[in-house]
From Swiss-Prot:
Free-text function comment from the UniProt entry: Regulates the transcription of the pyrimidine nucleotide (pyr) operon in response to exogenous pyrimidines. Also displays a weak uracil phosphoribosyltransferase activity which is not physiologically significant.
Protein name: Bifunctional protein PyrR
Superkingdom of this protein's organism: Bacteria
Entry's family note: Belongs to the purine/pyrimidine phosphoribosyltransferase family. PyrR subfamily.
Enzyme class: transferase
Motif PRPP-binding mapped to chain: 99-111
Reaction catalyzed: UMP + diphosphate = 5-phospho-alpha-D-ribose 1-diphosphate + uracil
Gene Ontology biological process terms in this record: regulation of DNA-templated transcription
C-alpha cells in the first residue's frame, strides 16, 4: 500500500469532530433548534460522533438523522440502473430548524447539492449548514462548508479515503495517489 499516505489519525479525527461540535454550538448561539443530518454512508457516524461530543460538553442530546441522496444524484445514470436506495430517517420536523448536513469529504459539491434537494423534500429549515471532515477542493458547484475538520489540497488523480471504526473497523483518513475513480 505504498500509494497510501495517512493524513489524519484516529486521535486527529476525534479532535477535529470535537472542534466542529464546539463551532456548531458557538455559531448557532446554542443547540435548541439544531438538527444534525448525516449523509449516507460515512456522514452518519460522523454526525453521531459530533452529537456525542456536544452531549459531553453541553449535557444535551442533539437530534441526529440520516439522509440517503441516491435518487437525488445527477450521476445516477452513470452508476447504473441497480443503484441501491437506503432509508432516510430524520427523527424530528426540520421546518424552522437549523439543519447541519454532515459528510466525510467535500469534493465537487454534487453530493451536497443532492442533499439540499433531499432536505427540501423533508421540510423548510430556517437555515442549512454543512460540516465536513475533509475539504479537498476541486468544486464544480458554488458550495462551501461552514465547518471543516481539515482542508487537504489534492490533485484530481488522488483520492481521499475516510475509514471509520463503524464502517471499516479503523479510524483514519488517507490519500490514495493516482487512483481517483470518482
Amino acid at each position: 500500500m505504498s500509494n497510501e499516505k495517512q493524513i489524519l489519525s484516529a486521535d486527529e479525527i476525534r479532535r477535529a469532530l470535537v472542534r466542529i461540535a464546539h463551532e456548531i454550538d458557538e455559531r448557532n448561539g446554542g443547540l435548541q433548534h439544531v438538527v444534525l443530518v448525516g449523509i449516507r454512508s460515512r456522514g452518519v457516524p460522523l454526525a453521531e460522533r459530533i452529537a456525542a461530543a456536544i452531549a459531553d460538553f453541553e449535557g444535551t442530546r442533539v437530534p441526529v438523522g440520516q439522509l440517503d441522496i441516491t435518487l437525488y444524484r445527477d450521476d445516477l445514470k452513470l452508476r447504473g440502473p441497480a443503484a441501491r436506495v437506503y432509508k432516510t430517517d430524520v427523527p424530528t420536523d426540520i421546518t424552522g430548524k437549523t439543519v447541519v448536513l454532515v459528510d466525510d469529504v467535500l469534493f465537487t459539491g454534487r453530493t451536497v447539492r443532492a442533499a439540499l434537494d433531499a432536505i427540501a423534500d423533508l421540510g423548510r429549515p430556517a437555515r442549512i449548514q454543512l460540516a465536513v471532515l475533509i475539504d479537498r477542493g476541486h468544486r464544480e458547484l458554488p458550495i462551501r462548508a461552514d465547518y471543516v475538520g481539515k482542508n487537504v489540497p489534492t490533485s484530481l488523480s488522488e483520492r481521499v479515503k475516510v475509514r471509520l471504526r463503524e464502517t471499516d473497523g479503523v479510524d483514519e483518513v488517507v490519500i490514495l495517489r493516482g487512483t481517483n475513480n470518482d
